[in-house]
Structure formats: structure tokens, C-alpha cells
């Protein structure tokens, strides 16, 4: 899979491989072939699911955190 050359920079060094693995796993679960030939809707569904899972993970890690 080609690297994304967007201006977005990852805040945690070395996390790109884990994100790519998550992307591939979700695409497989959804039956989506990622890439330029896939529809925007199909590619977007994978990106949306990644976001949902990362937010859920962050919320569970923050559970019980108070100021």
C-alpha cells in the first residue's frame, strides 16, 4: 500500500504501521478493496470506522480520569 503523502503528520512516531494494519483489517471485515479503484464511499467507510475505533479506545483509556 502506498504511503499517504498528505500534510497530516502523525503525533506518535512509529504508529504508521499500526494504522495501516488497522486499515487493512477493517477493509477486510467490510469486504472493501482499498485503493484508487474503490469508491469514495467504500474508502470513506473504512476511514470512518478507524476514527470510531480510535475514539472508543481513547474514551476507554480516559475512563475514570478527572481533573
Curated annotation (Swiss-Prot):
Alphabetized InterPro entries for the sequence: SASP_alpha/beta-type, SASP_alpha/beta-type_CS, SASP_DNA-binding, SASP_sf_alpha/beta
Organism: Sporosarcina ureae
PROSITE patterns: SASP_1 (PS00304), SASP_2 (PS00684)
GO molecular function: double-stranded DNA binding
GN (gene name): Su-2
Name of the molecule in the record: Small, acid-soluble spore protein 2
Superkingdom to which the source organism belongs: Bacteria
Residues of the site described as Cleavage: 25-26
UniProt keyword annotation of DNA-binding present: yes
Protein family (similarity comment): Belongs to the alpha/beta-type SASP family.
Function according to Swiss-Prot or TrEMBL: SASP are bound to spore DNA. They are double-stranded DNA-binding proteins that cause DNA to change to an a-like conformation. They protect the DNA backbone from chemical and enzymatic cleavage and are thus involved in dormant spore's high resistance to UV light.
Misc. comment: SASP are degraded in the first minutes of spore germination and provide amino acids for both new protein synthesis and metabolism.
